[in-house]
Amino acid sequence: VGGYAAEMICRAGVGRMTIVDADTVQPTNINRQLPALHSTIGKEKSAVLAARFKDINPDIKLRVLPVFLKDGNIPELLDAAQYDFVVDAIDTLAPKCYLIAESLKRHIKIVSSMGAGAKSDITQVRFADIWDTYHCGLSKAVRKRLQKLGIKRKLPVVFSTEQADPKAVLLTEDEQNKNCLLYTSPSPRDTR
């Protein structure tokens, strides 16, 4: 989600952008992520996106941070520049919630992407306040965490109303031996 959102913002002509992503392109990313090509496997996603965005808009001022966001570096990141808007596409709960909380605390506009894994019906994608979402485990977990942090403010999110297909979930390990969930989609001939 992050790569697609960032590219659309770049194509819209934004003048400055910060890209934060410490991941490298993996073969399992090719089915869904913008920077993932056979020629980019093993490269930093942030560097691949930066080169792409400079090719789209040579005048864009990019700040590229190949780091994982953690509680400790999020305030520093948000205080290092004047941000008009934050697009959150983090899929790990703790840094996602902390980025949301710190952005709201600083009155920085933010939109957050919720879970779409094991879902395939694009007609069920919605834009709503996080407090109005349903059938989304990530939204529920984020709401709980925000409540613990005392945050009950509105937060625009993109989510899916579709219930996840448990048959489409596979547990695997990534390059750092962290457990990952992979999602499969039905082939076009299997969808009705």
Regions found by a protein language model. Give the residues of each.
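Glycine-rich phosphate-binding loop and adjoining beta1-alpha1-beta2 segment
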Residues: 24-56
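Conserved S-adenosyl-L-methionine
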Residues: 11-16
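Glycine-rich adenosine-cofactor-binding loop
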Residues: 1-10
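A charged, well-structured terminal subsegment
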Residues: 143-159, 164-174
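Single conserved hydrophobic/aromatic residue that forms the stacking wall/gate
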Residues: 183-192
